[in-house]
């Protein structure tokens, strides 16, 4: 059964990324299948995961370009999978609101329910 953990706070610099990356790595070290979704336009969790690709697929491509989520998940250097973040997520927020698709993320995660122990 997939467990979803959300780490959120409006204030910057409080350790959200550090907590998320370390939690994902710790769970992966115990042989659990983990997907970290980086929703930060700065993409710091993506960088911390060791993703070197210049413009990796993000939720933006899944929403606007109908890219498969499986083509948007990358393996981290610490043993967990990551759906990268990046600057295009700023436009995604507007698109979701304008198209009245507030359930987009929930539906996207639902499709992965059986593939990961933790998201």
What do these predicted regions represent?
Residues 1-119:
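P-loop NTP-binding core
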